[in-house]
Regions:
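Metallo-beta-lactamase
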Residues: 1-127, 131-137
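Active-site metal-binding motif and surrounding structural segment of the metallo-beta-lactamase
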Residues: 13, 120-174
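General small-molecule cofactor/ligand-binding pocket signal
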Residues: 89, 173, 190
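Short, polar loop motifs at secondary-structure junctions
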Residues: 92, 175-180
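Active-site metal-binding loops of divalent metal-dependent hydrolases
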Residues: 109-111, 149, 178
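Short glycine-/acidic-enriched loop or helix-start segments at secondary-structure transitions
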Residues: 116-117, 155-157, 183-184
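Helix-loop-beta element that forms the nucleotide-linked donor phosphate-binding surface
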Residues: 182-190
Length: 190
């Protein structure tokens, strides 16, 4: 059996075993050095996040509510998206329901209480998601985009809930190397 040639942005690496990886083809791209990363981190203005991300201050639920006040989803607007515009509903963290050019899709569905491989430990949600896979008014989806396999972007329970609701016809767009994870969960439209 003859293999197809790899696209230009795919690269085989490894001396003792072969691994397919993505290679950035932009001439302007360069991997930052450790000293450049440290310099960048030190240049960040601490007041931008009031210490929540780079300091020892822990954000409270009230801080989150003030920064990201919850709004009810306008399901009537979702049911009738504008033809010539992009419409998006943020569910929380990485999850967005987007509608554009006649397509309705989700990004990085995470509906679980914790961004963790287990639900008894790990970072816990401060506010519930605006909608879940079980939301009755969630429209038909054309596809789901998963950006990468961190727990706060690829949530097993949410993926399985969407697959259970929409069935094998739901298309999944995932990064290189992630298809086996989906096929291992009996999701083959990847």
């Amino acid at each position: 059996m003859e293999s197809k040639p790899l696209p230009a942005h795919h690269k085989i690496t490894g001396r003792f075993w072969q691994t397919r990886v993505f290679e950035n083809l932009w001439d302007t791209w360069k991997e930052p050095t450790a000293s450049e990363i440290i310099k960048w981190m030190r240049s960040r203005e601490p007041h931008m996040t009031r210490g929540f991300l780079l300091g020892n201050t822990a954000a409270t639920p009230a801080d989150f509510a003030a920064a990201f006040p919850p709004h009810a989803v306008d399901w009537a607007a979702v049911a009738d998206p504008p033809a010539e515009a992009v419409q998006a509903v943020w569910a929380g963290h990485s999850t967005v329901l987007a509608q554009m050019e006649g397509f309705t899709f989700l990004t990085d569905p995470v509906f679980s209480e914790r961004a963790s491989p287990v639900q008894f430990a790990g970072p816990k949600r401060v506010t519930p998601p605006a909608f879940t896979a079980a939301s009755l008014r969630l429209p038909a989806l054309d596809f789901v985009v998963v950006s990468h396999n961190h727990y706060d972007h690829l949530d097993r329970a949410s993926v399985l809930a969407l697959h259970g609701r929409y069935g094998p016809g739901l298309r999944w767009y995932v990064p290189l190397g992630l298809k086996p994870w989906f096929t291992g969960h009996s999701i083959h439209n990847v």
